[in-house]
Amino acid sequence: MLLRLLLLLAPCGAGFATKVVSISLRGNWKIHSGNGSLQLPATVPGCVHSALFNKRIIKDPYYRFNNLDYRWIALDNWTYIKKFKLHSDMSTWSKVNLVFEGIDTVAVVLLNSVPIGKTDNMFRRYSFDITHTVKAVNIIEVRFQSPVVYANQRSERHTAYWVPPNCPPPVQDGECHVNFIRKMQCSFGWDWGPSFPTQGIWKDVRIEAYNVCHLNYFMFTPIYDNYMKTWNLKIESSFDVVSSKLVSGEAIVAIPELNIQQTNNIELQHGERTVELFVKIDKAIIVETWWPHGHGNQTGYNMSVIFELDGGLRFEKSAKVYFRTVELVEEPIQNSPGLSFYFKINGLPIFLKGSNWIPADSFQDRVTSAMLRLLLQSVVDANMNALRVWGGGVYEQDEFYELCDELGIMIWQDFMFACALYPTDKDFMDSVREEVTHQVRRLKSHPSIITWSGNNENEAALMMGWYDTKPGYLQTYIKDYVTLYVKNIRTIVLEGDQTRPFITSSPTNGAKTIAEGWLSPNPYDLNYGDVHFYDYVSDCWNWRTFPKARFVSEYGYQSWPSFSTLEKVSSEEDWSYRSSFALHRQHLINGNNEMLHQIELHFKLPNSTDQLRRFKDTLYLTQVMQAQCVKTETEFYRRSRSEIVNGKGHTMGALYWQLNDIWQAPSWSSLEYGGKWKMLHYFARHFFAPLLPVGFEDKDMLFIYGASHLHSDQQMMLTVRVHTWSSLELVCSESTNPFVIKAGESVLLYTKPVPELLKGCPGCTRQSCVVSFYLSTDGELLSPINYHFLSSLKNAKGLHKANITATISQQGDTFVFDLKTSAVAPFVWLDVGSIPGRFSDNGFLMTEKTRTVFFYPWKPTSKSELEQSFHVTSLADTY
């Protein structure tokens, strides 16, 4: 194969010796198994599993029990090979590098049968000097070692003491010792995902040749001068200089929209050199800042930086630069022990509302630009402003962060360490240091990233005794923890990026953890930092179940995906809640029973004699249960923003677990694999609305709060309505006098004893009626219509099966569903099967005879296709 040379950034007339070339090695490769019995083509970027699937040697890895049947793939040692010709004499170049942006994971790299380097970290860039090895005709081999075997070998060599955990719980069908390999930790199995320890070249690979120097990293960070009230821009460019002579030239920075044109003289000496440029923006120039979604615009400015160096060598970089500040505020709170824990963006306190992001697929080459756009657009469509990139996955691809910049999604960025203790031997630490240095350089220019976090739950795992470690080794583990996350990761982060905070773990007690030597005896202290909270036994409709914490960065409940999603990876014999498939797909111990337990607290379990009908009804009820549970919990956190009760409160963040799915299985997600919205995601669109009325009971008293995430005070009125389950006619209604909710506050709007409320509504009891309420001004709805159940729905009286029909019409690219119902219907679920798209609302309480809902397709469809696929379910249909 003849590869063309891409001449980079060289002006016309420049001598060939000054040019830089980049030769892409993406595309067609060959792979073979350890014994050579399997030989096949493969695509780079990619992995072995994808290559086998594309050649139909294996079926869909997600189908039924294939995660077990295909375990042999990860246990084998695979080799990638590429033969290519170069039409240029590489000997004319001073330096030639073979660069891998990502290798998964443990491999020996050979060029023309000469070993040129080893890899052991999925998360770092590798650059190998091949100046004296490259020829006109070349063969690259990447000989991978099984990650499963490697992890076991590294664990066996660590004989001084145990580094737990050894293996995941048996229910996860996973592999052991993932903490000994710098690889996507969930690829060895997790409680929501399969074990697929991949091998492959998962990112870009190329050859770079140059004579003078090469630009390796280009970074920039806006800095606000509080004293001068001006913006500055720091631009850092990392060069590899191979010339023995001093290289001189100019760096020209241009930001036309800010009237910036600045020229700097620069000099580069031999070796790894970083050029720092400082751009001071005139105080008279108005700079529009970047704001999170819902709080303002995501204004960015086009910037170009041109390096014109000796001999006509020219490098040009273009980027969008955003201006914003971020501050993590930990300060005393009146009438409360402890400290606050919240983020200020551009000086404004922001309540983080969102979810947690996990890898969108076990096979990263299947995560397309379209899929990222769909998932992240669904984030802002649900009124979220933040995601936590969880530490057991991957540092996401560049496009992920670019989309978050564009959409205004704040990112809490974990480093990739999760639910484990880790070794601190020299080889491991050397690899981690390279990883962290690379990722900070790669990511720090993104305004969307507002904080770094050292790990997921590892402080809690150590200090709360998750792994039954021997007491005599506690100090050893503490020393290792501080060595890894504080002395190394934290040090590297703070040296490379002074523009955003770093916390050592999540959950953590923040400043208190630091004061206690980086590990707190109780990392879940509600008076400090962030917490993670899960409780599948207590009644999730009871708000007293939940912690009145400063910031809740994980919480949630499981549900099953829709039947249309499961159908693609299952067969008819699997369509039962007690089937082998249903048990196999559930990776949380007792998870399926815990869902039934929560359902039984407030709903009737399906009892149809038709097995498929009962299965579908159960799937539906798990989504109803999950949505209602997370709604109750999130609303509790939102109304806790402005209050302190018994020293607890001032909650400033709610990130539920989890946003997306890695495969088709029961999980905590609100988006199914492929992006279909669960009922929870529709609920999130309401409970994360900028203005929300929240209702709850305490000692027979109904309270309604108003929670505002607006930037300005708002005058409005509250309307409270009562319906019976047996009639579509409104029983009674009352409205308050106009009042003002202050910007960014949560305040009590309404209190009334429930017996008094019902007394004024003829024929109403707790079991026969339901309360709804909303905020409005001058007849205009300002909030979602919220509701409060006065009893468990399994005890509801007068609830009938509703005959709900839909008339579908098309308006441009949108479809209109005009609904009619014969009865009050809770949890009305509209479904169009596998047709990709989302509704404007779903899972709603229908108390009116008619309602109009819109469907936004993600791919072209038709009215007839929607009519054929349409199905509607409400709660009474499951009885």
From Swiss-Prot:
> Which cysteine-cysteine pairs are annotated as disulfide bonds in the entry?
167-176, 540-629, 732-761, 764-769
Cite a single GO MF annotation: beta-mannosidase activity
The record lists glycosylation at: 35, 77, 297, 302, 607, 803
Gene Ontology, cellular component aspect: lysosome
- Function comment: Exoglycosidase that cleaves the single beta-linked mannose residue from the non-reducing end of all N-linked glycoprotein oligosaccharides.
Family of the protein in this entry: Belongs to the glycosyl hydrolase 2 family.
Name-wise, this protein is Beta-mannosidase
Gene label: MANBA
